[in-house]
Amino acid sequence: MSHNTFGHLFRVTTWGESHGPALGCVIDGCPPGLSLDAPFIQQFLDKRRPGTSRFVTQRQEADEVKILSGVFEDDRTDGPVTTGTPISLMIENTDQRSKDYREIRDRYRPGHADYAYDQKYGVRDYRGGGRSSARETAARVAAGAVARRVLGEDILLRGAVVQIGPHMIDPKNWDWAETQNNPFWCPDAKMAAQWETYLDSVRKSGSSTGAIVEVHASGVPAGWGAPVYGKLDAELAGAMMSINAAKGVEIGAGFAAASMSGEENADEMRAGNDAPRFLANNNGGVAGGISTGQDIVVRIAIKPTSSILNEVKSITRDGEEVDVRTIGRHDPCVGIRAVPVAEAMLACVLADAKLRHRGQTGH
């Protein structure tokens, strides 16, 4: 299996499976001299960690990260710092229940990667989905923490869930602080209460539901990205679509721009102090593939979890028609834990863009 690496200068390779002994990543291209230790990375892994509420999988994993290489400390450094060599990070799996999956080892879960993997490789790890499991995203979150060090403290990355099932937040109620007060990363306190009732019913019914995640990057300077085939928004879209269960991406106004007039969609400008003052951000912070200095805004549609308790029609590897239900511990809405993953992918793309911009322009 190839294509386990993304990025150009800031390159991340993830490895490992859902029910293997461990998973992790190798990061190449990180500049030397950046402060980096395990507790810094751990804070982001804890945001994604399973078993934190009844609305996510009850698999109990500490997700404790271990730094295996690329970081050094002695009496001449101010704490652990990156050396510029590959950074290897590892997270052990400790709560696998592979026996839960024996019933489906020869049966395909509709909507999952089972059938496609079998057709391509002729073999698949049915235990939790192997590489196709959302468990792989723990490594991405770890890499995203390193990317944040590359970006520095002037760039703020934040994410939220803005829709679960048919229930969408009211943008007028948006409060970033509220995302820390509920298990959904919801910026609308009123909608968070509705989601709790809705997801309880979904969970008890044995089904699952989808979500929309929105991530923002503030403080990105104008000029990152490149025209045509190196567009920053194209890099962002590709990174977000690589997330497990992602089925759609919007940047800025996204598909709503199709119903706007030219005047409505224009991000009109007025003179500011050191930079233009934009009157709108329908471009989502990117124009012509290059950052404008506005907030970068990306939304990701996350499909319902494919592994559900309710029976669905499928076939076996031999073509026999069967009904499939998945016994195990699964997220009723995997979109909730996709928030720190989307933040991490945003961080990695921007870190790569920063290094590429510096290499091309010298600043």
UniProtKB/Swiss-Prot annotation:
Coiled coil location: none
Gene that this polypeptide is encoded by: aroC
Cofactor: binding details: Reduced FMN (FMNH(2)).
Organism: Hyphomonas neptunium (strain ATCC 15444)
Gene Ontology biological process terms from the UniProt entry: amino acid biosynthetic process; aromatic amino acid family biosynthetic process; chorismate biosynthetic process
Residues holding NADP(+): 48, 54
Quaternary organization: Homotetramer.
Transmembrane segments: none
Protein name according to UniProt: Chorismate synthase
Molecular function GO labels: chorismate synthase activity; FMN binding
